Amino acid sequence: MIDSEGYRANVGIVITNDKQQVLLAKRLKQDSWQLPQGGIDFGESELDALFRELNEEIGLSFEHISILAKTPKWLRYDFPDYHIKHKQKPVCIGQKQVWFLLRLISNENNIKLNMHTQVEFDDWAWVDYWRPIEDVIDFKKPIYEDMLKALAPVLFNNQHKIPNQYLRPLKCSAIILDK
């Protein structure tokens, strides 16, 4: 659903393991990596969208994960002009996302990328917490930095160090949902 400002509402998903690594997924038939994310349908809650996207993209359901935290507000990014479909109405200029921090509490064999008719990813890997900022497409890097900075205190119990190259000011702090 696109709002009056041209942003599509979206949930982003950060899945962690017991080594505090995150699941990074490779876009189908592309050399492009990102965290799972997806649109919030009309009338759908953030949590409903989270579980639908989690199942469609990664094959996991609520019994496989624990929800740790979320970002408290929408984090926005704009599409580069070449991504904007100017003839489509309403025009979507970017996405606004709320991000959820999850912990995988089941076996990673439950991760299945082919659970939906429209498969989005063809590979995945556990990576260092900060690596998604480097691997994601350039126009998403600032939102990844903002989101990972906001969620890090929850995952690392305030015992984290933000790498020096990430100098953007902290935009928000995570809301703890479960501990």
From Swiss-Prot:
Belongs to the Nudix hydrolase family. RppH subfamily. A motif (Nudix box) lies at residues 38-59. Residues 6-149 form the Nudix hydrolase domain. This is RNA pyrophosphohydrolase. Accelerates the degradation of transcripts by removing pyrophosphate from the 5'-end of triphosphorylated RNA, leading to a more labile monophosphorylated state that can stimulate subsequent ribonuclease cleavage. InterPro entries: NUDIX_hydrolase-like_dom_sf, NUDIX_hydrolase_CS, NUDIX_hydrolase_dom, RppH. HAMAP family: Nudix_RppH (MF_00298). Gene3D superfamilies: Nucleoside Triphosphate Pyrophosphohydrolase (3.90.79.10). Its EC number is 3.6.1.-. The keyword Hydrolase applies. GO terms for cellular component: cytoplasm. It is an enzyme of class 3 (hydrolase). Its cofactor is a divalent metal cation. NCBIfam families: PRK00714.1-3, PRK00714.1-4, PRK00714.1-5. GO terms for molecular function: mRNA 5'-diphosphatase activity. The keyword Metal-binding does not apply. GO terms for biological process: mRNA catabolic process. CDD domains: NUDIX_Ap4A_hydrolase_plant_like (cd03671). The lineage of its organism: Bacteria, Pseudomonadati, Pseudomonadota, Gammaproteobacteria, Candidatus Pseudothioglobaceae. Keywords: Hydrolase.
